[in-house]
Amino acid sequence: MKIHEKFENYCQSIRLFLVPFAPLVILFRCMENIRNFCIIAHIDHGKSTLADRMLEMTGMIHTTENAQVLDSMDLERERGITIKAKSVRMPFKSQDGKDYILNLIDTPGHVDFNYEVSRSLKACEGAVLLVDASQGVEAQTIANAYLAIDAGLEIIPVINKIDLPNAMVEECRQQLQDSLGIPGKSALLVSAKDGTGVSELFEAIVMLVPPPKGSSDEPLKCLIFDSFYDTYRGVIPHIRIFSGSLKHGDKIMIKSTGQIHDVDEVGYFTPGLTPTGQITAGEVGYVGAIIKKVGSIHVGDTIISPEHPETEGIPGFRHTQPMVFCGIYPINTNDYIKLTAALEKFQLNDSSIIYEKESSAALGWGYRLGFMGMLHMEITLERLKREYGQELIATMPSVIYKVVTTDGQFAMIDNPSKFPDPTRIDHIEEPIITLRVFVPTEFVGPIMALSDEKRAKLVAMDHPDKKRAVLTYEFPLAEMITGYYDKLKSVSRGYASMDYDFLGYHAGDFVKVDILVKENQVDALSFISIRESSQTKSRGLIHKLRKLIPRQNFEIPLQAAIGGKIIAREDIVALRKDVLAKCYGGDITRKRKLLEKQAEGKKKMKMVGSVEVPQEAFLLLLKMEE
Amino acid sequence: MKGLYVHVPFCVSKCAYCDFYSLLGRQDSIESYVQSVLREAGAYPPSFLRRDLKGELSRQNPSIQPPANEALEDFPSAADSRQSTYKKTSESAQTFQTLYLGGGTPSLLGPQNLTTLIHGLLVSPLAPCGRELERGVTSVVESTIEINPESAAPEFLQTVKNLGFNRLSFGVQSLSDCELKSVGRIHTSAQAVAAIKQAQKLGFKNISADLIIGLPGQTWTSLYASLETLVKMGIQHLSVYCLALEEGTPLAENPPADLPSDELQAHLFEETRAYLISKGFVHYEISNFALPGFACLHNLNYWRGGEYLGLGPAAASHLAGQRFKNYPNLDSYIADPTGQIEYIEELSKKEKAAEEAMLRLRLLKEGLDTIALAQKFGTDNVEDIITRLQKLSQEGLLVKDGSRFRLTPSRIMTSNPIFARVIAE
């Protein structure tokens, strides 16, 4: 593979040539004591634990106990993943007697955030590639390693969790060699948990990661690799300065928009915000410029000096495009204003979320939200509920379909209820991703069967080593977001891992299925399906709905329809008996509590026409596939 | 306080559907149980209520107490004597006007223990003033004891009569031996018929029978046979309950295949209602039918949000606006009958008003008078309830008649969702 050769050459040149002379290499300016690096790993391979250990050993924090400092959101810790990239500046005294500044730039660890990862990598010169000794190389190990190699980073392979009884160090070395062409022998052995090997890792970072290049005398050029919102200081971009310098009172310009701001504060992350007089080329830090509008700062954008508007932006910047959409609605329509406020506040800390107003005949006013992926969506909905105390109905997730109409026009539609009349549609195209599934060979069969069900097209099957296979698919994104990942994990007993890229739009025979509850169309339940499986899906959905909607005082027909044609139907018969009889020697409390429980249940119902539909009816459809 | 309930937690065998507190094979503890009940009665009012209750009693607000004759207003033909006694005795809030021995199986007490219990209660602080032991409970307006057909020995019934009980409630449940067996009842239909006849012979003029709708294998034919026999025997009151599968009961764990569906149960109930009404019974409460003048006063007091004291393990009480309940534990009850309160429920006035509204709506004839409710709880506390009631009547679930609301008869079998909406929107 080309990329392997490239990497091989790169390693060789660094190791054989540069390393022995490293102390002798004299770089210009005073950047030779700075090392900017990140840690990349598959999810759960111990990235945050390693970061904690590094902070502890450099005295940035005193005790970590169980806390993972860089994962500050509860939910991240709960799910063991880092959503938001953060960074920290650590002083380090090397065995060579010199003082160094190590800037650790944390990267998001999930497949939904590839773009953010690539931007974080851009801010570094080196990457610690972390592999869990008990798990071995997995899909995101490889995906992230390629991103780092493409970004021209020095890679330091590290095998983590060597303290585990089931650590397979030799296998990991071999896998690094076989699947990435990284010399496995050079991998450092570390236990981030107990600190073994971390000092050696620091030395390796100092020795192997090249110091940043660039000059403080040249015009300002900074990469924004993250940002957060502070109530008093506005949006605070996290930056890596490539050239020039920044201090209080300077003016800065956002390259993509041309907006100019006055610098109010600059500083480092230690890991809190520590103001400093000036930050210069090669450094990592933050800039406060009272930027009030959240949408004005995008990850990957470049900050330049308004005196040099001709300065070129750092290549690779793009506005992130959400891939997955769903509608959210308050249970109680009166809570719409609360929901609006919650979303506004929410977006301040996750600008990758987009939202716009939407209204549903069944659910009233709500919002359509766009997410980077399925996991991003699940986490966001969870956080919205948790942090803002909002009960929500989330509709079935949808991808963006390209709908080509008979007049030759096309529209990108992210909401099934907005599809034009079937007679006006020439054809529909759906987003396809390239999906790579990493799996032990014994699970290849079940994974192939599962993927076949999901209309996946196998384009390649590789065996990076004897025990493992990589299946590469052209895969419909719509199938991905309806429970593929969960199923992948379950059929492989948790061993499979995956990674994906957007490939393009492919045409298919799609239909829009509408769901009618007692003759009322529930727009929030409409879905797009390939025609062939639309009836099976509809039957499954109607059947589930029948079980979810409680019997009421009247009969409730449930129907699925394509256009005007009913393709599935079940009826919920009228409630005939729900009565409390015996009075239990005057135990009224018990009676009242039963009724209160019923009343409580009613509050969680959404009225669709005259029918009370429980929230779960909408939620369960999120994972409709069965 | 109007009602006194005594829970008798002993049974010979446990019916498959029953989740009441009752114990098998503990008859040897009956004597100590009776002593404990009398100790509990002697300690009235319960210590936590003593201050409250005295305050409450001294400022006894007449508007809080429903009119004494309310119980009888639907039954113009009620015996005058009952009415006058009721009026007279209702003056003292500290004594009871109705007595109800429920269970379990109160008829397991036997003549001796029952006599000890009743005599003890009559000399307790609870007893209506000036009672003489030899008159028994004759001057308590209504005194009921639940009788199981298999333990209705003639001498026991005689004791009941001698003690002055004026109402018997027979646990008949069905007159089909098949159905009785299917839920673990240990008596036959013949025993039930014989017991009722015996009671009638002894001169009991207010007899009630419990029937269950929804027994395994039940059909309208079999239910009709049970109803017809009982009505022809001339009983005055019928409680007709729908079988409920209560969590943890053998019936719920292992439901038989031939349990009637909800649809069939609803149908059986409608038929029962039509039949009993045609025979002159008044459907005065969701599960209760009575000939005019024979509604159960003790239970009416429950549905009207009235006050009562429950004695015995697992017994529930409602005093000074608070509901509380004893622990369901016979042994700890015997050891310390006055220290058994499991919980005391503190409800706001609004919650109390909603509770009473829900309870009163169970009274199909009498219904809920919103003016009286507002008088009792304050206009502010009933506004929301009235709004909800009005909405329900617009939807046809309640019938509005001036300031009074009643449950729409066709909605009886599906009244829970309606009551849930009365309690809270």
Kindly give the residue locations of the regions a language model identified.
Chain B
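C-terminal scaffold of the Radical SAM
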Residues: 1, 22-44, 95-125, 139-379
